Amino acid sequence: MAGLSRILLSCTLACLLAGQAAQASVDDPTRAGGDNRVRALRADQARRDVLLTACRDDPGHRRGEPDCVNAERAQALQQWQAAAMTSVDAAFSDLAGALRNAAPRRMEAAIVRLTRQLQPLVYSMMTLLVLLTGYALLARRDRPFEWHIRHALLVAVVTSLALSPDRYLSTVVAGVQDVAGWLSGPWTAPDGAAGRGGLAQLDQFAAQAQAWVAQLAGQAANDANPGSAVNWLLCAMIVAASAGGWLCLAASLLIVPGLIVTLLLSLGPLFLVLLLFPALQRWTNAWLGALVRALVFMALGTPAVGLLSDVLAGALPAGLPQRFATDPLRSTMLAATLCATATLMLLTLVPLASSVNAGLRRRLWPNAAHPGLAQAHRQAAARQYAPRPAAAAAAAGPHQAGTYAASATPAPARPAPSFPAHAYRQYALGGARRPPPRVRRDDRPAPAPDRRVLPRKPNLP
């Protein structure tokens, strides 16, 4: 994390320096006046044609005059927009279309078609659940009352879900959409309009990046100098790579967690059935853990994308397409650095979400085994307080160590639960620990004792 913080600090300083330099270049009164005249000539095509004709007729005397320079710049800007590369335009159009097509209704229809095939399996599991519950009610009448209530509620839930799977799936998808809309609600559009979703902000940024890359690629195509054309093409590739990386990562953080949550909730009834089988309850715990992890990424990713989209839109200069014509390298580095900084800040969400997920799992399932330092500490504590078989074997003697090691270190017995429901809950949460395996007994006979008579030591005075 130290290296990542240094990278973020360096990118932030570079953005600040580039922004100050770009602002200083824009605030120059001579350049501002030139930009205004270029815009006027770009709008007035007749005057621009007259100036270009006069400059071409007398290139020796009027080539370096401001009017000729402004007319050529206006003509170049007009040509750059008209001569955008078809491949780049198509690529960004496909990306924007993919963002627009990731609509909730399409996702809902796909999930409904996918899970509708599981309806016979849901009916079979529901029938098996009813039969098992009836068998338990008839064969084991000593069950506590809460056990019957829990299983009756489980049967009712699974039966209702099996009778109306489409309505259940539509409710799940609508709930996930409402949660995603509520998470992205506080973030407004850069121009002060009403609140919009994160996909709309990414679509607007994709359109802006498409215009930038088309302008740079068009200048590279129209430049007669090969060296300058290569420079323009490199600038276009830098902007396309940085903007494309930001768009892909932001879109994945917006779409993938919601899709995973919807799929897990749609398959929830199948995992609820597993609560009846003690050996399969860990699958339900794994399903709950995956659902919590996806909800954490959804709760952190959607606001982060909205916030960074607003920051990125506010940090980018307003007249960036015009600056690409006057100062392409500085404008390219400014746009690329801002996009790279936003991408790195999104990447820091992964360890943050992992730590939050680990904390939630420790709070929700305190007795479950967790990977990492917590499990290592628990294993070390168990080894510290466990009886030591080596000391007991040494006390038993060298020959009886293998035979009586198991009896010298008895295995701790499982504590008897106070009532069956407590044992059921403890086993379901993973709190009940099986006793450790007994030490393997050495059934070989002990060696015969040495009965030889040893010489006695003389009694010396």
From Swiss-Prot:
The keyword Signal applies. Residues 376-411 have a biased composition (Low complexity). Residues 1-24 form the signal peptide. Residues 439-453 have a biased composition (Basic and acidic residues). GO terms for cellular component: plasma membrane. One of its GO terms (biological process) is protein secretion by the type IV secretion system. It is found in: Cell membrane. The keyword Transmembrane helix applies. Residues 376-461 are annotated as: Disordered. Pfam families: TrbL. Keywords: Cell membrane, Membrane, Signal, Transmembrane, Transmembrane helix. The chain crosses the membrane at residues 118-138, 232-252, 253-273, 294-314, 333-353. Disulfide bonds: none annotated. This is Type IV secretion system protein PtlD homolog. The gene is ptlD.
